[in-house]
């Protein structure tokens, strides 16, 4: 077991040397640059680790406890718990630096009831991967598994990322989110402007620079939007929305969303009526009247 009050992970980052073309070979200038964390190949051990405070790339991680494995330059964390941005996080991770400017990683994370605005402001990777959080204030939870390549600045190479999981919205206020506000303007649905969203779980997958958003529904100001589609890490949109109208959402407006997050393009179709869904309940759902079903007529060939 290893215990520490303070660890600065940035000290393990690589440094590269570059030569100033205006100097001779004997006057090489050493320039410190950020590189990936390289773990020495000679280290081989397993331990239970705990630390009161860890500094890593502008993050402050507190009260870390977990199992740590180091072997031939590879780091593994198993069932590790810590506090970050005021919330408890559980994480398992696998990390290996192929060279000073490239590392591969894979991790599973579970963070419950955290402040989405604080996460956007303080966690660089969250800010890059969830840019819409810039316009959100409130509480969400995250369960996600993702892997890929980290480059020299310890940020992901986005086309390399692959994973999936869910974001659960407990209570969030969207302010100035251009997608919702553009839909609001196009459909005269004022309730969609700066909406309050609650009790929604959004499932997504990531592959080849694309975030795929599985269909999800929510209620806001009497409307019942249903959204699905894709967005890319460079902000492009290809999404569908059905805006269920008050009071029950049975009548809805189909909407096509393209363009970018900064400049969404909204296409509106004609109102349609949804088919009523009915879940089967043992002993409660009326049985089909078989006598009312017309017989199957078979075609005959003469």
Where in this protein do the model-derived segments appear?
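Membrane-proximal interfacial segments on either side of biological membranes
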Residues: 1-199, 203-206, 223, 228-302
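Compositionally biased, intrinsically disordered linkers/stalks adjacent to structured regions
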Residues: 216-218
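Short, charged/polar, low-complexity loop and linker segments
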Residues: 210-211
């Amino acid at each position: 077991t290893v215990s520490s009050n303070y660890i600065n992970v940035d000290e393990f980052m690589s440094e590269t040397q570059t030569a100033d073309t205006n100097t001779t070979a004997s006057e090489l200038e050493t320039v410190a640059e950020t590189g990936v964390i390289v773990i020495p190949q000679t280290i081989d051990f397993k331990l239970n680790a705990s630390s009161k405070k860890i500094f890593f790339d502008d993050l402050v991680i507190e009260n870390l406890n977990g199992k740590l494995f180091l072997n031939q330059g590879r780091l593994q964390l198993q069932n590790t718990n810590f506090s970050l941005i005021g919330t408890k996080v559980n994480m398992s991770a696998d990390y290996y630096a192929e060279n000073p400017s490239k590392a591969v990683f894979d991790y599973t994370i579970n963070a419950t009831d955290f402040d989405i605005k604080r996460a956007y402001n303080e966690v660089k990777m969250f800010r890059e991967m969830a840019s819409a959080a810039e316009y959100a204030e409130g509480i969400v939870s995250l369960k996600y598994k993702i892997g890929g390549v980290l480059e020299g600045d310890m940020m992901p190479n986005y086309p390399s990322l692959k994973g999936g999981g869910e974001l659960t919205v407990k209570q969030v206020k969207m302010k100035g989110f251009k997608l919702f506000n553009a839909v609001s303007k196009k459909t005269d649905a004022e309730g969609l402007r700066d909406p309050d969203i609650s009790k929604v779980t959004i499932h997504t997958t990531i592959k080849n620079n694309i975030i795929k958003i599985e269909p999800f529904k929510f209620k806001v100001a009497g409307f019942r939007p249903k959204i699905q589609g894709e967005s890319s890490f460079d902000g492009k949109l290809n999404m569908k929305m059905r805006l269920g109208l008050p009071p029950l959402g049975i009548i809805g407006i189909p909407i096509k969303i393209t363009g970018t997050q900064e400049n969404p393009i909204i296409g509106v179709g004609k109102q349609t009526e949804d088919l009523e869904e009915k879940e089967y309940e043992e002993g409660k759902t009326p049985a089909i009247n078989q006598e009312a079903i017309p017989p199957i007529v078979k075609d005959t060939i003469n």
